[in-house]
C-alpha cells in the first residue's frame, strides 16, 4: 500500500506521519502545498531523525503514486486524483507549539497511522 501524507508546509504533521508509517514497514511519501524551507524545529527536537529532511512540494505524480492520500489541513489546495482513497485528519499544526503539545500531536498521528493498512 502506498500512502501519501500531505499538509501545508510538509514540515511537521506529514513528515511525522511518513516516518511513523515507514517505521511500521509501509511505503510512504509526504509533501506540502506550500513547503517550508526546513522541518519545524519543534518537530526535529522531538523526532531528531527528521531534522535533515527537506520539505517537498506536492505534485500530481505523488498523488498518482498513492493508493491512499492522507490530508492534514491543506484544504482545497490538495489535488484530487480519481480512484484514490482520501482521508482527512483534523490535527493541530505543531509549528510554534511547546514540546508537550508536539508530543501529543505526534502520539495522535502514531495512533492513526497504526490504523492504516500496510
Model-derived features: positions:
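Short polar/charged helix/loop
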Residues: 1-118
Amino acid at each position: 500500500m502506498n500512502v501519501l501524507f500531505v499538509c501545508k508546509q510538509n514540515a511537521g504533521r506529514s513528515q511525522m506521519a511518513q516516518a511513523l508509517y515507514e517505521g511500521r514497514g509501509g511505503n510512504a511519501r509526504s509533501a506540502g502545498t506550500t513547503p517550508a524551507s526546513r522541518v519545524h524545529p519543534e518537530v526535529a527536537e522531538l523526532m531528531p531523525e527528521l531534522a535533515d529532511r527537506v520539505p517537498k512540494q506536492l505534485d500530481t505524480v505523488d498523488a498518482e503514486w498513492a493508493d491512499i492520500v492522507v490530508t492534514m489541513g491543506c484544504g482545497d489546495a490538495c489535488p484530487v486524483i480519481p480512484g484514490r482513497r482520501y482521508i482527512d485528519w483534523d490535527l493541530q499544526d505543531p509549528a510554534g507549539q511547546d514540546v508537550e503539545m508536539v508530543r501529543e500531536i505526534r502520539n495522535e498521528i502514531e495512533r492513526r497511522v497504526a490504523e492504516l493498512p500496510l
